[in-house]
Amino acid sequence: MEVFYNSKFVKNNEFLKPSAAQFKPQIKYPFENNKLYTLLMHDPDSVYGNRFHWIVTNIFNDVKNGEDALLYTGPAPPPKTGTHRYIFELYE
């Protein structure tokens, strides 16, 4: 899976300012015909425990064609809570 914010490829463990990720990213992945996928984006470092920022279900060949079970919310960690990781997971 590849994640792009503003057409820029984001590498694993790459630091982004929250302002650079306020809009839905583009997700590219190899897919198989006749299979459905689910995409999760979450912040395991939230002060309230694991917090989901985006859930898309019933994805066929493009995330844009899936159903938003949870609308995208960009990163906005509270001040003085350290660096937060935002993890994308794709399930068949």
Task: Report each predicted region and the residues it spans.
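N-terminus-centered regions that define maturation/targeting leaders and the start
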Residues: 1-92
